[in-house]
Amino acid sequence: MSDKVSTSLAAQLHSHALASAEAGGIGGVNGGPIACHASTDKDAQAPPLQFEMDAPAAAISAQLNFKIVPADSLPGLSYQDMFASMNTSQISNASTESSCSPPIQGAVPPPKPSRHMAVQPLNSKSCRFPKLEECAHFHYERVQLGPLSVQLLDDKSEHMGSSIASQSLGGDLPHSSLRSFSPESCWFIIRVCPQRCEPFLIKRSFENMQLLDEMLHRCVYDRKISGLRNMEELAAELPSESDVEYAVAKYLERFSKIASDSLTCGTILTWLQLDNKGRRLPLADGETQRTINTPAVGAAYGVRRYQAQAPDEINIEVGDMISVIDMPSPAESIWWRGKKSHLQKSLYEVGFFPQSCVATIGDKVPRNFPMPAPLVGHLDASPTKPVLRKHGKLIAFFRSFILSRPSRRRLKQSGIYRERVFNCDLSEHLLNSGQDIPMVLRSCAEFIENYGVIDGIYRLSGITSNIQRLRRAFDEERVPDLGNPEMKQDIHAVSSLLKMYFRELPNPLCTYQLYDNFVEAIQVKADEADERLRLMKETVLKLPPPHYRTLKYLAEHLYKVSQHHGRTGMTDKNLAIVWAPNLLRSPALESGGVAALRGVGVQAVVTEYLIRNCHNIFDALDDHPARHSMVASATAAAANAAGGELRLESLTDCESLLVEQREQDQSLGVVERPKSLSTGGAKLISLEEAQERHSRVEGADLKQSLPISMLTSASSNAASNIGSYIEVGGGPSSLPDKYHTVLSAPRSWQKRKPDKTPSWKSIFSRSQRQGNPDPGQKITTDVKDSVASRVSFVQASHAHASKELTKHDKPKSIELLETTSNERDPKPMDLCIRSNSIDSLRTVGHSRSVSHDSYFDLLQSPQRGHMTTCPSRELSELGLNFDREEPEMRIFSESESLVSSPRVGKENVPPASGSATRRIMRARPEDFSSQTNSVNPSPKKQPRLNLLSPSSARTMPPPPLSAPGTASSSCGHESGGAENCCKRYKLEDQLCDIQFIDCGTPENVPTTQQQFASVEVHPPPKPARANQSPISSSNGASVGSSSSSTRYSYPSVQLGAKRKEQQDAKERFSYQGTFTQPGQKQESSAPRPVHSTNNGATLRKPRVEPVEDGQIKLHVPTPTTPARSPRYSLLLCDTESSDNSSAVNTPQYDMEPLMLTSAMSGVSGVSSNVQQQQLLLGVDASSSYLGSSHESLGQNINNHHDAEQRDMNALKRELSLDLNPLQPRLPQPANRAATLPVKDQLQAAAAAMCSSPNNSNFTDNTSQSVTPSEYGYQHLQRQLSMHSLLATDESSPVYEDFEQTPVKMVPSPIKSTISITYKSPEKEKKPSAILETNFDENTVYEQVKLFRNSVTEVNQMLHERSSLKQIAEEEQHDGGAYKAAEMTQQLLQLEQEHHDHEEQQEKEPEDEEQSQLLYENIELRKPKTVYENLRGEEMKFITEEQKPNVDRIELDSLDSLPDNMEHEQSSPSKSPTFSVKELANKFESSPVEQLPNFDFSVRGGSMKKPNELSVPKTMPAPVPLKKLNSSAQKITRSLDENAFVREFGGKQLQDLSLSNKLPEVMSEVNSRRKSFDFTRPKTLNPPKRLPGMSITEEICQKRVGEMEAITPTTENRISLIQQNNMPKEQQSSANQFLPPAGRKNVLTGVVLDRERIDKIKEERRQQLTQKYYGDTLKSRSRTELNSEDNFPAAESLRIKSKSRGDMHALQKDIDMNLKQLSRVTGGGSECTLHTGLSQGNGQEHLGQQRVRRISDEKNQNCDTSNGGVSGITSTSLLSVKTTAQKYGSTSKTPANKFERSQPMPRDRLQRNSLAESNAGTNNREKISPQFSIRDVTAMFESRSQNQ
C-alpha cells in the first residue's frame, strides 16, 4: 500500500515536476533551486490515485484527486514563477506533505474546487527545514521596500487561472471533514507586488499567516497602531473557508497599507520572499535554481529509492550520485539538500531528500551521530570510495564539521552560542532573549538610580576597561555584578555602557522611519502644547513594540535622574543633550548631508520633551484616543481602512526619509551593512568608481532628493541599480554591478590586506598597522611616526573638519562624492573625511554600531566642532575611530562594535603610532564627550586623548598644552557632550577592546593607565586647565590622569586600572567622594603653579607627551601596579585613598596630600605613575592629584590657597609625626607652591621630581617630571624646602619640624634640593644654605616621597630586581612604621649633618660647571663618606631588621640597598628599626617570597592604611623620608645626606639619635658599600629574581630599584630618588596603615633600624649635599636645559654624562662610593627601567632620545627616558650604574639602553636601562637627575613625534 501511495504520489509529483521543469525551475523561500523532472511519462499520465487507508492517508481519509495543469495554462505567470513562489516546504513544515503536490480535480470535485484555499494533508508533519526558533532572527539595518502590495488571490483571479495553486481536496469525505476544517489546514495563494520587481506568487498556509502576524506585532507594529486582527484569535472565529479567506484577504489588504520600510525583520521579509531592497529573494529565480553553484560539502549515493513529495524535493534512485549541499544533523532535520545530475548532463536537479536514503561517500565523514530509524545508508553499510579523497583533508574536515555541527538550540543551551546584545537590533535582541526591555537598560538604570546620583552622571565617561568588561559580560548574556565596590567607584562606566548600547543600535531607539515624525511633532508651535503632545504620542505609538517599551522605560529612568539635577547638575535638558544622539538619528544626518547640522538641535529638543513629558506621553497612551483610533477590528473594515490610511501615512516613511535612505543606499548603503562585509561600503569600490557612480546615480538622485518610491518609479533603472542588491555594507552606489563582485572584492579589505597582512598580529599589537588602512596617516606605523602621525592626524582632522563643514554647505550628492572619495583616498585628510562621512564610518565597521559612530562622527563633527576646541580633529579622529572596516576587522565578536570602532579609529588614526593611533581614537571620542562633558568618558580614553593631545601639544608646544594637551585630555570636553559621550563610550569600549587585544603590548598597558590618567572630569575647568595647561601639560601624564581624576570626580580610581584592581574598589570608591574633586582642584592648582614657572610650557609638553607614551608604556610594565595605582585614591584623597596614598588616609582632603600619599605609597605604581607624577607635581604645585590637573587646575586656582593651607597643615602633620604627613607634607609644599610663585615652582619641581620617579615608570610622567625637575625642581624644591619648613614651622620649628617631617619631606626636598640645590642655591642664594638645607630636608623628604613613587614605578619596571628590594623594603616598612619616629629623628640628625655637608657641597658647586665636576667628584668623593654614613645608618637599620638580608644588601647593595634605603627611610617614619642590611638581605635572600607577601600586604595595607595615614601621628615619617632618601639614594644620600647633615646640621642635631646612629650607619654603609660594590651586580641581577614579586609588587620592586638607581643621582635624580624614597617611607608609614602599592608595601614590609635610617639619612644628606653641589649644577643645567629646551638639556646632560664618565672612572676607583651609588643606582636603574618601560611603546622614541641626551648629559637617559624618575635616578644611578655596570648591573642598564636606542617593549627598556647602568656613562646619567633627563627626552620624543 505504501508503495502504491508513494508510487502514485511520485508519479503525480514527477509529472508535475516535469511540467515545472519545462516551465522553469521552482524556487522557494530558501532559494533552494528545485527542478523535479518526471522519470517517466506514464507517471505523469497516471490516473488519479486513490490512497488506501494508510495511517497517513487515514488522516485525510479521502481520495485525493490531483490534476496537473501545464504551465502554459497559467495566463499571467510562468508556471515556474507561480509555483516557485508557492514553495510551501520553504515556509512550513507542512511542505513535506503530499498536499503540496498539485491537487487534481477528479471524479468527485471539491465543493469549492476553485477556492484559492487548500487544505493541507495531515499525514506528514516532519519538516525538512529547521524550526523557526532554530533560524537566526535578525533585522536588516536598512530596508527600502517602497510601496508594497500583498493580495490574496482567489480562484477567479486571472493570475490563478486553473493553476495547481487553486488546489482543493476532492472527495466527499475530505470535503465534509474539510468543511468542518480548521483554518490551519488552509493554504493561500498570495500575490506579492513589490515596487522594484515583478509581482510573484507565494503559497502560504494559515499557520504561516499566524506566524506573520506574530512577527509583525512582535517586531514591527503595535497591534493598536497596525489595526491588524490577531490571526490566532481569528482561527477560532472562522467557521468556514470563506471566512478564513475573507479574514486573510482583509488582513493582507490592511498590511499592504501599513507596510513600509519599518519592516526590518528578516523573518517577515523572508516570509514575503523579499530582501531589504524590496526585491524578490534571488534564490526564488528558476534560473538561479537550475544553475545553482553552491559548493557541495559531501558526496553521497542513493541507497534507497525516494520519490519527491514536493516540488522542492528530488527523486533518488539506488545508486544515484548526489552532491550534498547542506547536511544538517539529524537533530535539526532529517532533510538534506543536494543536487543530482539529470539525465541531461548539463542540468541539475536541486532539492531536498531524506538523509536516510543516501549514504555518504568517504570514510572521513563521521557518522557517529544518531541517524533516523531507517539507516540504510549508514556509513558502516556504505562502501568507501576513494573518489573524494583527492580533495584532501580540508574538504574532509569541512564535511565532517558540517555533518557533526550542533544545532543552534544546543549551542545556546551549552552556552557556546550567544546572541549579540550590543550592536544588535533591539527587536531582534529582545526576541532572541525573551525580554521585554534590554537587560542592559534594566540593570544599568537600576544601578544608576541607586548609586548614580552623582555629579555629571551620563555626561562623564567611565573607565574604558570597565565599560568593556561590562559590555563583554552583557554580550555573554550574563548580568555583571554592578553592585560590587569596584563598579560603585566607577559609576560613570555604567552610564557610559548604557549610552553605548543605545548608540550602537542598528536602528535607533526612535527609529529612522519615525525620525521625521518626531521632528514634525516637536516643531509644532509652542502655544499648541496639546497638539504637540498628541502628535508626540501618536509618533511614539508608531514605534515597534520593543522600541516603545524600551523608550518608555528609558524616558522614565531619565526623568528620575533629572529630578536629582541639584546634585548631579544634569537637568532634563542636559540629559537630552547627552542622550539625543543615542536615541534619535536620521539617515540623512548619517549620510553626511547638509541635514547633518540640521538635526542636532532638534534631537535634543525631542529627547528633552520625551523626558519631561514621559508620563503624559507613555502613561496616557492606553487611554489616548489616537491609539484606540489606530485599533481596527476585523468587523469594522471601513474603520480599519480609514485608520489604515492615516496610519499608512504615519507608518510609512516620509519622502525625505526615503530619500535619505536612498542616499544611504547609494552612499551609505554600502556602509550600512558592513556587518555582513567587514569592508566598509565606501571601500568596496575604488575612489574613481565611487565618484563616478555617485555622480552618475546618486548625484542626481541626491540632488533631486526624490523619495525612494518616486525615484524608483521615475527611473526604474537607476532605482533598480540603487536598490537591486542586498545591503551588505555598501549601497548600490558602491557595489559593483555584480553582487558577487562586491563580496569578492571589497576595497577596504583589499587595502587592509596589504596593510595588515599579519592581521592577526596587528590585532594584538598597537602597531600603526591597525591605523594603516586608508588613512594617509600610515606615518603612525613607527612610534616616532606615531607622534608625527598624531600631529598630522590632528591636522588632517582639522582639514577634515573644514571639509566636513564645507560638505554641509554642498549638495548632498557632492558631499557624498567628496566623502566617498575622501574615504577611499589614502590621505590623512581623506581618511578623516571618510571616517567622518557616514559612508566610510558605516562601511568601516558594523553598519549598526559603526553607523552610529559614523553618525556621531559625522553628525557630531560639525556639531561638536563648535563645541570642541579642535572639532575637525575630533571629527576626523572620531570618524577614524568609527571606521567600520576597522571595527569589523577587529575579529572580536563579543565587542565587535567596540573593537571595530577602535580599530577603525586606528585605521583612521594610522597617522599616529599604533599606540598613538589607538590613544587618539580613544582620546578623540573621549575627548569629544569629555571636554564637552568635562569628563572624558573613560580615563583610559582620555589619556589617549591626552596622549594624542600631548602629541599635538608638543607639535604646538604651549598651545597644545592648553589647547592640544588640554584639548586632547579635554578633547572630549570640547566635543559635544552628548554626542561626544556617545562616541566616547563607543570609543571607550572599542579602545578597551583594543587594549585587550593589544594588552600584551607595552603601549597598550600604559594606554590603559593613560586612559585612567586621562580622566579629566570637568570640561568647565578645562578653560582653567587651558590656562593651567602648562600645568596640565607639564603634567602631560597628569593631564591624562588629571582628566580621569577630574572626570571621575568620585571614581578617580580609574587611573590605576590594573594595579588598582586590588585597590580599585577602594580607590575608586574613595575617589567617588566629593573630596576628590576639591582635592583634584587643589592638585591641579599645584601643577599649575609648577607650570607657572618658566617651565610651564616645556613641562607641559613633556608631560603631555609622556602621558601619551609613558602611560601607554606604563600599562605594560606594571599591569599590576596600574590596577593598584591609586590614581583614583589620589583623587580620592578626601575619601579613603588607594593603598598608595597614605596622605589620602589622612583626614586631609587636600588632593595634594593624596597625591603625595599615593605617590609616596607608590600604590599608583606604574599605572598611577602618571597620576603620581601628577600627584607629586600637583602636590608640589598645590595640586595633590595630577589626574585632576586640568580640572583641578581650574579649581586649583580657587582651591589653591586652601590646598596650600591644607598642604601646610598636611606638611605640619607630616613634619610632626605623621607617616601620612610625609605625603601630606609634600602636598603642603604644593599648596605653598600655590601660595608662592617660587613655592609653586619648587613644588611643581618637587612634584615633577616626585612624579619623575613615578614617571620613570611612565614616560609621560617622566617628561613632565623632567620639565618640572628642570624648572620646578630647582625652584620648587627650594621653595618646597622653605614651604616644608614653613609647614614645619607651623607644626614645629621649620628646621626641626622639617627635620622630623623631612623624613617624609626630605626625599622630595632632597631630590628637589639635589636637582635644585645647585640651581636653587645658585638662583636663590640667599636661602641657599638655609633654604638649601631646608630644601635638602624637604627636598629629601619630598624626593624620598617622589623617589619612593618613582622607585615603586621603577621597581615595577625593574620589578625583578626591585622585587627583592621592595620585599625587603616592604618588610622594613612594615617593621619600620612604628620605628618611623625614631628613624625620623635619626634622619633629621642625619639631615642636619647632610645639611651642613650639603651646604658645604652646595657652596662648592655653585657654578654649573663646577656642579657637574663637583657632582662627579662628590659622587666619587662624598658617596664614600656620605654614602658610608648613610649606608652605615641604613645598614644599621637594615641589619637590625634584616641581618639575614645583609648578603642580599651586599648583592643588591647598589640596587637593593638604595631601594632599601629609600624604603627604609620611608619606613623609618614607620619603623626606625628598619635596617638596610636586613632590607638588602631580604631582597637578596627571597625577593620573590618577600616581595609578593609584602606586595599584597602593602597593597592591602595601603588600602587600609590611608585612614591611619590620615592620622598625623605618623609624624615620624619625616625620618623615614630621609631614610628613604638615603636608602633610595644610598650613594646620593651618602653624598647628599652628608651635605644635608652639614647644611642641615641643626635639624639633624634635632634627631640626635639619627646623628648618633649616623656614624655607625655610615661605617656600616661604608663596609657595606664595599661589599655592595661587588654585590651591586648581584643586586641588579637579584632584582631580576624579583619577577616573582613583580606580579604583586612589580611596581614596588621597580620603585625600589629606581630609588637605588636614583640615589647615585645626587642632583635631580637623587632628589627624585630621595623623593621616591620618601614616598617609600611615606608609603611604608602609609603601608603600616595603607601599604602603598608595591614599593610602599615593600618598605613597610621591612623595618628599617633607626640607626640605619640615620646612616642612610646621613649618607643621603651627604650625597644630596654633594649632588647639590655637583648635581645641582648638573641638574640645574639639566633642569634648565630641560626646562628651556629638551635638546639643550640633552646636550648639557651629555656633557655631564661625559664628566660622569670621568666620574665613573673615579667611581670605579672608589668602589665603596660606586657601590653605594650602585645601590642608589639600583633603584635608579630600576626607575630607569621602569621609565624606559613606561616610555617603551608610546614614548620609546622619546624615551630613547631622552636617554641618549641624558646619558650624553649627565643622567642616564635610559632611565631618564623611562620616566621623570629616571632623570633623577640617572643622577644617582650614574655612579651607581657605573658601579653596577662594573658588577653587572645589567638589569638596570638594559632599560636605559632600550630607551636610548629605540622604542622597545618595556622589558627591553628595562634591559636597556640596566645595560646603561652597566655602562659608566649610563650610570652617571642615572646619577644625574633622571627626571630632568627623562622629561627632556620625553619632551623631545613628544616633540619629534608630534612634529
Swiss-Prot record:
Keywords assigned by UniProt? Coiled coil, Developmental protein, GTPase activation, Phosphoprotein, SH3 domain
Q: Provide the tissue specificity.
A: Ubiquitously expressed.
Q: Which domain of life is it from?
A: Eukaryota
Query: Where does the SH3 domain start and stop, copy by copy?
Result: 295-363
- State a single Pfam family of this protein: RhoGAP
The record's region (Disordered) falls at 94-117, 746-780, 894-975, 1013-1106, 1721-1745, 1779-1829
Q: Where are residues bearing Phosphothreonine located in the sequence? A: T843, T1118, T1121, T1679
Q: Which GO terms describe its biological process?
A: retinal ganglion cell axon guidance; small GTPase-mediated signal transduction
Q: Phosphoserine modification sites? A: 166, 168, 180, 837, 840, 851, 861, 872, 876, 1029, 1125, 1216, 1281, 1284, 1453, 1456
Q: Where is this site: Arginine finger?
A: R459
Q: Where is the composition biased (Basic and acidic residues)?
A: 1058-1069, 1793-1806
Q: Where is the Rho-GAP domain?
A: 424-618
CDD domains (UniProt xref): RhoGAP_CdGAP, SH3_ARHGAP32_33
Question: Is the keyword Lyase assigned to this protein?
Answer: no
Q: Which GO terms describe its molecular function?
A: GTPase activator activity
Q: Where is the composition biased (Low complexity)?
A: 1029-1053
| PROSITE patterns noted in UniProt | RHOGAP (PS50238), SH3 (PS50002)
> Compositional bias (Polar residues) at which positions?
759-771, 928-939, 1071-1097, 1779-1790, 1807-1818
What this chain does, per the entry, is described as:
Probably functions as a GTPase-activating protein (GAP) for RAC1 and/or CDC42. Required for optic stalk formation.
By its UniProt entry, which PANTHER family does this protein fall under? CDC42 GTPASE-ACTIVATING PROTEIN, GTPASE-ACTIVATING PROTEIN CDGAPR
Q: What is this protein called?
A: GTPase-activating protein CdGAPr
Query: What species is given as this protein's source?
Result: Drosophila melanogaster
Source lineage: Eukaryota, Metazoa, Ecdysozoa, Arthropoda, Hexapoda
